[in-house]
């Protein structure tokens, strides 16, 4: 009976996971695919780009915990998306037909008469020889802070020279009981009445007891395990590991507390991508509940066009396939333009320049730029910075969301999807 209940829970988690993860079915893979994620117009610029030092993504640590978040077993939706984002998409070269003598059940071309399926040699090493090795990844679910720190220390100790270590943490900055998604309507006056429907939603998840002191802390809450101190990860906990190159992604309502790392490093300046403290959405506030859909910031980093559609309240049933493909072409063209801007000599901080040649990290940087520009133009100026992501060190002004070129890219994309009225463009 116990096993039955456990398996029933696992099946329920898988059904819930698949329901959220398959919202947009006919889309590009989350994994890095040379066909979709390299751009002919900017390829030569990236190839010619040379920094004084070049770092390669070798290891990544991924951890996520939010109360009632979408997961199955110990793999959360946010971690799954980021895990896929740091993998190469196989080209298919490793699928080989098993050579076998034809018999009564198998034809000479490798098809079985009964099923018509191609036999695949599952015993072979499932590694695509045409691709580089994937970065090594460690996944932790609801770790104690001491456990997380010990794993980080082990990876840093073994990190090869000229490599960088990516740390992705998705967690709440508050401990407390989820009271449901709260929302409020943003209005902008008669001149922009169309924006009156914009709703931002923010829900934090934590333990059953609310501590007013915890709500103002400068830490991430990793889960209800052990004493309160063992659940909290502070920016200072990561400082000893800045003796090695770090690429830190913090997706939290308290992400900006980790700005304290910048300037306090012990040897290597860390690259920081920090999420907004609150998500923003058009229309239904339910879209902003991370316990139902995963994090908006992580979705922008792993599936940017899907995140943009979610931002403006579009679903797969709302978008014609040809329109979606056209929007994807516009976004790819924008990414290509931004790559060229980033490759300009002397315009990029060394911290970003040394990781730009790495395809995984370059793609994350481009998607961060897209996320920041989209949210900057979507949210009202008086909303403040809590709805905007941030990065340290700063990226060049050429890719600032206030620049005319960046706004033109977002305007073209929003026009294609018929949602230009949802944004505030300075260029119009």
Describe each PLM feature range.
Residues 1-65, 101, 333-357, 364-366:
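Cytosolic small-GTPase signaling regions in large eukaryotic proteins
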Residues 67, 73-79, 95-98, 152-153, ...:
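Short coil/turn segments at secondary-structure boundaries
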Residues 86-87, 215, 220-223, 319-428:
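C-terminal functional modules of predominantly eukaryotic multidomain proteins
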Residues 56-59, 135, 161-166, 244-248, ...:
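Core residues of folded domains in eukaryotic genome-function proteins
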Residues 247-376:
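Active-site-proximal C-terminal subdomain of hydrolase catalytic domains
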Residues 19-20, 32, 42-50, 69-70, ...:
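Eukaryotic intrinsically disordered and solvent-exposed regulatory patches
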Residues 79, 86-166, 183-185, 207-208, ...:
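Functional beta-strand-loop-alpha-helix junction segments that form "active/interaction loops"
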Residues 173-241, 279:
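A short, glycine/acidic-enriched catalytic loop
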């Amino acid at each position: 009976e116990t096993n039955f209940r456990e398996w029933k829970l696992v099946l329920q988690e898988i059904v819930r996971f698949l329901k959220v993860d398959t919202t947009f079915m006919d889309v590009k893979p989350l994994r890095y695919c040379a066909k979709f994620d390299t751009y002919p117009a900017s390829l030569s610029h990236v190839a010619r780009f040379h920094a004084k030092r070049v770092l390669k993504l070798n290891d990544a640590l991924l951890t996520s915990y939010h109360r009632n978040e979408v997961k199955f077993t110990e793999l959360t939706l946010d971690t799954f998306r980021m895990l896929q984002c740091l993998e190469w998409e196989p080209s298919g070269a490793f699928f080989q037909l098993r050579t076998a003598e034809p018999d009564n059940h198998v034809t000479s071309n490798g098809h079985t008469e009964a099923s018509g399926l191609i036999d695949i040699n599952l015993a072979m090493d499932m590694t695509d020889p045409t691709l580089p090795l994937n970065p090594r990844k460690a996944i932790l679910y609801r770790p104690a802070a001491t456990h997380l720190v010990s794993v980080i220390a082990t990876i840093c100790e073994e990190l090869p020279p000229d490599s960088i270590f990516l740390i992705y943490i998705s967690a709440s900055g508050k401990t407390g009981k989820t009271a449901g998604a709260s929302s409020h309507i943003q209005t902008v006056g008669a001149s922009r009445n169309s924006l009156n429907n914009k709703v931002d939603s923010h829900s934090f998840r934590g333990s059953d007891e609310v501590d007013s002191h915890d709500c103002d802390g400068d830490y991430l809450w990793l889960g209800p395990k052990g004493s309160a101190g063992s659940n909290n990860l502070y920016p200072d906990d990561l400082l000893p590991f800045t003796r090695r190159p770090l690429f830190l992604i913090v997706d939290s309502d308290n992400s900006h507390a980790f700005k304290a790392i910048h300037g306090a490093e012990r040897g290597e300046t860390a690259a920081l991508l920090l999420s907004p403290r609150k998500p923003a959405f058009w229309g239904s506030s339910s879209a902003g509940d991370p316990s139902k859909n995963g994090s908006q910031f992580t979705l922008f980093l792993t599936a940017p066009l899907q995140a943009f559609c979610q931002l403006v309240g579009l679903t797969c049933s709302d978008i014609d396939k040809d329109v979606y493909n056209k929007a994807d072409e516009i976004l790819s063209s924008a990414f290509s333009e931004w790559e060229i801007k980033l490759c300009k000599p002397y315009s990029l901080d060394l911290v970003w320049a040394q990781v730009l040649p790495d395809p995984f990290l370059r793609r994350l940087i481009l998607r961060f730029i897209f996320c920041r520009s989209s949210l900057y133009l979507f949210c009202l100026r008086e909303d403040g910075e809590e709805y905007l992501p941030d990065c340290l060190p700063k990226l060049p002004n050429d890719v600032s969301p206030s620049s005319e070129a960046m706004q033109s890219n977002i305007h073209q994309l929003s026009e294609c999807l018929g949602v230009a009225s949802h944004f505030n463009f300075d260029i119009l």
